[in-house]
Amino acid sequence: WRFVRARDGGAIASFGNTGLGYGVPGNDCTTGGGDAWITIEIFRQYGAEGKDILGDAYYETVNHYVSSFDMTDLGAGHTKTVQQWAFMGDPSLKIGGYD
């Protein structure tokens, strides 16, 4: 939490696993789901999709994950990835601040 509580700065929120993050090694890490996919997706939602409100970016990220992978395949770890990927912060805040 040092990056969140840094004096004269710090983060406004944090996204991450509450448990062990699952992933696919190698080039498939961006296509196979798991921690790498969902972590990259939050940045895609912000940068490419323009979701600059934290809660909206988080919602769209999880929604896109759930619609992209088979949530009934428990062995693949997709359900666990979504359940363990937590957002800590105020969902109403705007990324980059307000003008």
What are the roles of these predicted feature ranges?
Residues 1-99:
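Active-site-proximal C-terminal subdomain of hydrolase catalytic domains
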